[in-house]
Amino acid sequence: MNVTSTWIKNPLAILADNSENGVVIQGNKIIELVGKGKKPKSTYEKVYDASDSVVLPGLINAHHHFYQTLTRAFPGALNKELFPWLKSLYKVWAHIKPEMHSVATELALSELLLSGCTTASDHHYLFPRQLHDAIDIQVSVVQKLGMRATLTRGSMSLGERDGGLPPQSVVQDDEEILIESERLINNYHQPDEGSMVQIALAPCSPFSVTTELMKSTAKLANKFNVRLHTHLAETMDEENFCLQKYGLRTVDYLDSVGWLSDKTWLAHGIHFNEQEIKKLGSAGVGICHCPSSNMMLASGICHNLELEEHGCIIGLGVDGSASNDGSNMINEVRQAMYLQRLKYGASKVTHNRALEWATSGSAKLLGRDDIGEIVIGKQADLALFKLNDMRFSGSHDPLAALLLCGAQKADRVMVAGQWLVIDSQIVGLDEGELIYRHSAAAKELSKLSQNY
C-alpha cells in the first residue's frame, strides 16, 4: 500500500529547530524537517501552504475530568474552595448516566481538539453503580474522534462512613477496583509507539481511597508496566487531612505507599516544602500544573521552576471542566505563563517555556517519547493556528502572539498524519447537534440531583 507524503510548507512560525521551511509527513510520522531556504529531499505528493499559520506540536492535556463538563458554573458549587466544592458536587455527579458520560466525554474531547490538543489524559474516578463501564464508554468516544488518550482508571474507596470525603454512593471496594483496573489494562492498553489509547491507574486522592488500595495499585501498575496518577498537595485541607489521618504530610504518605517513582505524575502539586520538592525530583516524579483550576478554587500556585530545577517534569492540564470551567488547551498555556510570571517574573517564564510544558513536558508525564515534539521519527501530531483574527492585528512575533494575544481555536489539527480539524471545524462532527445533546444531558442531571 502506498503511503502519502505531505509537505507542510513555509510556516509563518514553527516550534521546532531547523524547520523554517516546514516539515514532511509520511503516513503517521514526521520524516523530514526542511531548513530555511531549502526544499524537501524526500518525495511528496501533497503540499499544504502554511505561510499564514503558526505550527506547533499537538498540545497534550495531562489532567482532566471529562464528565465535569456537565456541571459548569453550577450554582451550588460557586465561590467555594476544593473540599466544600467537591462535597456540593459529589451528590450531583452520583446521578450521571452512561449516555450523559458519553456525550460529556465527546464534548470535552471536541473542545480540546479545537484548541489544538491532540492527546488528552482523563482522570475518571467516579463509578456509581449505573456507571461501572465508564472507561469502556470513553474508549469508544476516543476511537470515534481519532484523538490519542491516556485514560486513567480512577477510584474512590474511602467514603464518609470511614473518614473519607466522598459519599458512600460513589465509592467502591478495593477488590472490585483492582479487578476492573486489570481488565481495562488487558483490554485497552496499547504500549507500542504510535498508540492511540493507553491506560493508567489513578486512585483519586489520599482523602478518598484507602492506604491498602494505594499500595495494591502501585504493585499492579508495576506488574503491567503502566503509569500511576493521582491528585496531591492541591490544598492545605489535603495536607491537614493526611497529617490527622496518617500522621504524615502528603509526600511522605506517597512514599509510604510505594508511589515515588518516575512512572508517577501528580495533578496540582502546590503545597510542597523545599525538602519535599527535592525528594520528588530525586524520584523523577512528574507534576501536572493546572493553573485555571488552581485560580478558580483559590488553591495556590505550583512551584514549577523549583520542581524543574530539582528534576521533576512539568506538564499542563486543564483539569475538570467544572473547576476551570473550560477545556481549552491553548488558553491553559496562556494561563500557565501568566500565573507563573506572577511568582517568578516575566523573564523566567517565556512563551516558549510555557509551550514546552504543554507539549514535550506533558508527553513525558504520560511516558510518551513518540509525541510532543516536531522531530524526525515522531508522530505527526500538529496544531496550526492562523493569526487573522482582530485580536492578533498589530502583533509581530507569531509564536509569542499565540499566547499574548489569546489564541482560542486552531485552524487545522493533525493526529497521526490525519487532518481531524479543518477551518476550525472537526471533520464529520455536527457541532450544534453535539451541543444540543450535551446541554440536554446537563439539564437532566441537574433535575435528577434535585429529586434526591
Q: Where do the model's predicted regions map?
A:
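Histidine-centered catalytic micro-motifs
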Residues: 58-69, 227-236
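N-terminal metal-binding scaffold of metallo-dependent hydrolase/deaminase domains
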Residues: 1-41, 53-55
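His/Asp/Glu-enriched, well-ordered alpha-helical/loop segment
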Residues: 256-263, 305-389, 404-405
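Glycine-enriched alpha-helix->loop->beta-strand junction motifs that scaffold or abut catalytic
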Residues: 220-227, 259-262, 279-288, 309-314, ...
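Metal-coordinating catalytic core of metallo-dependent amide/deamination hydrolases
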Residues: 130-269
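Alpha-helical scaffold segments that flank or form the walls of functional sites
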Residues: 73-123, 128-147, 179-193, 439-450
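Active-site gating loops and adjacent loop-to-helix segments of metal-dependent hydrolytic enzymes
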Residues: 70-101, 130, 158-174, 236-263, ...
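C-terminal cap of metal-dependent C-N hydrolases
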Residues: 11, 379-435
